[in-house]
Amino acid sequence: MNKKAIPIGIENFERMIKEEYYYVDKSMLIEDILVNRAAVTLFTRPRRFGKTLNMSMLKYFFDIENKDKNRKLFENLKISGSKYMNEQGKYPVIFISLKDLKADTWEKCILEIKKTVSKIYREFQYITENMDEDDKNTYNSIKNRKNDIDLNTSIELLSDFLYEYYGNKVIILIDEYDSPIINALNNGYYNEAINFFQVFYSSALKTNDSLKYGILTGITRIIKEGIFSGLNNLYVNTVLSQDYAEYFGLLENEVTEMLDYFEIKYKMKEVRNWYNGYCFGDKQIYNPWSIVNYLKEKEVKAYWANVSGNILLENMLDHAGESVYIDLKKFTDGESIEKYISDGTTIKSLLNNDDEIWQLFLYSGYLTKSEEQIKRKEFSEQGYFTNTYNLKIPNREIRSYFGNIFINRFFGTEVKTDILIKALENGDKECEG
């Protein structure tokens, strides 16, 4: 019997199933979304933890186009036994990925946005057949990249057209919603990007009468940017949330089954040491990118860390003070440290506040909470509760990355070398004490 292929880099759900790659069944994510019925859901998880593949799965499940063909993709999955299969193929779906918006100027970014929106409009060209001339002209001007005025409301406009055509409300999927904003900060056009995406997102998700559900993925929880201001129906699910914890990354039993299938179950101990250790909600999670690459290479090494460079994190380290490096030393020594994690932040404030760096380390997958439960403290003078978590490095892969990349890179700059050496010396003294 031919074995299924190892799915390295496969993010299209249809291809995953039809071309018989090994697929870890995450289809009950669909049922949980339908049970919870949040109008708009934001999932934040680290890079390469299955966000795009899950979004692709949602597209193929809900999409009203090709619904009979798409139904076959789910025949052998857990969701096929759910009563919520009656929701399959019922809705028009707009799927927009923003993870490749990497332009170095705002002018180039706008061109990339136009290209992305144009591609989506071309996908639905058939709905123009029943439009009046005014609507058809508006549609075609956006499709042909000639309409700048309606660009920031183009997703809302498309959902209105789809609702009118099908008579069913629309599901909007936005993958890597924060990628263009982070890239804008790194390249000096943050204000222009924020002004655009505030309207782009809020028009599609907040004031949209044609919306059934909106689902977004990203890495950061940048609630305070104003992008989601007034969006009372937004549910934010992070690595700290209890719900949906099992759907991004791999559970222990899923990894065991994979290693057994590929006949290397005896390697489970070293796999656990290198790639386990993430605590999402109350679940222990393995890094899926590292697991599939390990299955291919049969060698323990840093797979995820070596391809998940984070320019924003590096910029933050460039601006960081001595206390950050002292804590980095403690983390590499295997300590867990209690840190405050805010409910939301602005991307721009990350560069100006050393305390914010730990939030980005956590959400980006370089740190995880320890198994100890949340410690909740009341700050009565401010009149609100804050969350503090015991954070730690999750596994040997990330510890090797801290040692070889985050710390060693600063020996290339004179200023940071002094800070780092001082921090390491102080850390050693504390250990001796």
Where would I find each of the regions flagged by the language model?
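Phosphate-binding site recognition
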Residues: 1-433
